[in-house]
């Protein structure tokens, strides 16, 4: 998962290369960038980082991305494949000028094997799921005939209920914005 099935746009490739060098760490990519339902310059790129020092990595990400700590979300995630519970942090980074969106998840190194098992399990989808995801994304990204709410609702049904048979247990906790940032 250090490489991707689909070619990243050149800006995204350069972004991850520079950030990987800056952090002295590897990215592991998952989600649509690894599947047939990836839409270049529309789909976000999901990436995992594993580290022994999450707080240090978050500080480095803050510096590189030019974001505040409260923009990171803490989360708890129940992995279905290994029945483990992991904790981590997530940042959604948007560069509108380059039509680039990424979600980077930061986990402790000890959870790496379990998280990768979970994420690899959704790299190869049944044909009918891929087909419906491509139709859904075409309606949303290319034709603009469905709302973000509708898109998210049906994607959740396809990816969670039709693959896992249940909802993904993922709880995000926003880090509150300090009063002096307002």
Regions found by a protein language model. Name each.
Residues 30-32:
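Glycine-rich beta-strand-to-loop/alpha-helix junction loops that act as flexible
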């Amino acid at each position: 998962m250090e490489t991707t099935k689909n070619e990243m746009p050149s800006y995204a490739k350069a972004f991850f290369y520079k950030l990987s060098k800056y952090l002295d760490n590897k990215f592991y990519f998952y989600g649509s960038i690894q599947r047939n339902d990836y839409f270049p310059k529309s789909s976000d790129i999901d990436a995992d980082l594993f580290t022994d020092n999450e707080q240090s990595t978050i500080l480095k990400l803050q510096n590189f991305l030019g974001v505040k700590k409260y923009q990171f979300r803490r989360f708890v995630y129940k992995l279905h494949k290994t029945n483990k519970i992991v904790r981590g942090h997530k940042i959604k980074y948007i560069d509108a000028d380059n039509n680039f969106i990424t979600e980077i998840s930061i986990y402790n190194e000890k959870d790496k094997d379990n998280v990768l098992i979970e994420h690899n399990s959704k790299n190869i989808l049944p044909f009918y799921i891929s087909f419906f995801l491509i139709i859904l994304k075409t309606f949303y990204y290319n034709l603009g005939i469905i709302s973000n709410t509708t898109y998210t609702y049906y994607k959740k049904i396809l990816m969670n209920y039709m693959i896992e048979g249940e909802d993904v247990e993922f709880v995000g906790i926003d880090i509150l914005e300090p009063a002096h940032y307002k």
